[in-house]
Regions:
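Alpha-helix C-cap/termination motif
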Residues: 41, 45, 86-89, 140, ...
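Catalytic metal-binding/acid-base residues of hydrolase active sites
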Residues: 13, 100, 154
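Short secondary-structure transition/capping segments
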Residues: 1, 37, 59-61, 144-145
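Thiamine diphosphate
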Residues: 17-38, 104-173
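Active-site diphosphate/adenylate-binding microenvironment
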Residues: 57-138, 143
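Phosphate-binding glycine-rich loops and adjacent basic patches that engage nucleotide phosphates
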Residues: 1-4, 39-49, 93-100, 126, ...
Length: 173
């Protein structure tokens, strides 16, 4: 954890406070009530990342990486290029990734237009995240097209979830 961050622990059992990590604030309450109170407290909070977000947005506009690369065999950038073409035609599309290089390609090259359009486990290293998260996204947004970008290892860990996708009528690509 970043030493500068403040850690809040919400629990219904006070004996759990500071058990695994020292916290700055302990809230003895139901999680729903505690999170609701925290959210309410954030209203009017100044976005401390506004300057960075503006700089990053300008950087992205200037630094367009070439992804329309026609090589044989096909290269990862070309796959992301084709997915971007689909996203540009279908703004409701949701993309999930597994971990590994496929995740890095997506994070570097994917055009994300809105919040919750790109779902990834980030740096948590959860191999096998891609397909189950795609199925979950489809369950939450059944009218949206959902695709996952995964590798052989991640797919092999959760390939049985294709049966879940079919059984629950939650088609994903």
């Amino acid at each position: 954890f970043d030493k500068a961050c403040k850690v809040v622990q919400i629990d219904i059992d006070a004996t759990e406070f500071d058990k695994h990590r020292n916290t700055d604030v302990n809230l003895l309450c139901d999680a729903k009530k505690g999170v609701s109170a925290l959210i309410e407290g954030l209203y009017g909070y100044k976005d401390m990342h506004a300057d960075w977000n503006k700089t990053y947005s300008e950087y992205r506009k200037r630094c367009k990486c070439k992804t329309d690369i026609d090589l044989k065999p096909i290269v990862p950038q070309k796959i992301i290029y084709e997915i971007n073409r689909l996203i540009d035609k279908n703004d409701d599309m949701i993309v999930t990734t597994d971990v590994g290089q496929n995740q890095m390609w997506a994070m570097h090259y994917l055009h994300v237009h809105r919040p919750r359009q790109f779902l990834s486990s980030g740096s948590f290293g959860t191999m096998g995240f891609g397909l189950p998260s795609a199925i979950g996204a489809k369950a939450a947004k059944p009218d949206n097209t959902v695709i996952t970008i995964t590798g052989d290892g991640g797919f092999q860990m959760v390939q049985q979830e294709l049966a879940t996708s079919v059984a629950e009528d939650l088609p994903v690509i």
